[in-house]
């Protein structure tokens, strides 16, 4: 029976690009380096979303039209794709939890991710495969055991809403008023580039030999040094 590969949108721009060897081992052996971001970023996210859910997306920036964030009654917590194949007709599935999905008043849809990060105009380029992956899920939706993913089409806007600490304006002995700069980085859809990338990832995973250590990967360097030290110990 042909293998159906499974990818999380969030791993496509991080684990997959960071190190081919670590990604290969992670997907085949379920071993994760454990390099998760500090919990404080989740805390920022938990504060940002409730506020922005009450706002019109047009107020976020000039690039977004009138719209509102879709809530849990319209979207399941986890969304999945169905029937996707790469450029070599190999089956794969996408499954994940989108940050922000927007329904615009003109009937179109948008996908936005909130990031507390150093602001840059092209920040969304760092997340281009993640954002397009969510667009592909909504274009070819599937179902989990508990919920069906809705088909949302067309998805006309994708991007990253960036937050960066700016200043503290007031404080008491238990809290403070904290301002953050914001900036929206838009991303154009690129379906062809996405499928080219997925095809390369599946090519990697179908290799029978584990990829070589990456010189620019800290985990590879750490593991390689451990091996070197062990070999020296065995020579004694």
Regions found by a protein language model. Give the residues of each.
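Metal-dependent nuclease catalytic cores that hydrolyze phosphodiester bonds in DNA/RNA
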Residues: 1-108
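Hydrophobic, Leu/Ile/Phe/Ala-enriched alpha-helical segments that form helix-helix packing faces
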Residues: 55-60, 138, 142, 201, ...
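Short catalytic/ligand-binding loop motif for oxyanion handling, primarily in non-cytosolic enzymes
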Residues: 24-25, 32-33, 119-121, 166-170, ...
